[in-house]
Amino acid sequence: MAPPQHLCGSHLVDALYLVCGDRGFFYNPKGIVDQCCHRPCDIFDLQNYCN
């Protein structure tokens, strides 16, 4: 498993597509940017944003 990392902008969106796949995701910029851009997050944090 990858270590937690900072994901911002297009890197964050690409990671969500990779993690969520066909399920898609809901994009709440404030929540996910606070969680994954300002602080490092891991795959489990990203899965919380999948549909």
Curated annotation (Swiss-Prot):
Its main location: secreted. It is found in: Secreted. GO terms for biological process: glucose metabolic process. This is Insulin. Insulin decreases blood glucose concentration. It increases cell permeability to monosaccharides, amino acids and fatty acids. It accelerates glycolysis, the pentose phosphate cycle, and glycogen synthesis in liver. GO terms for molecular function: hormone activity. The gene is ins. Disulfide bonds join 8-37, 20-50, 36-41. One of its GO terms (cellular component) is extracellular space. Gene3D superfamilies: Insulin-like (1.10.100.10).
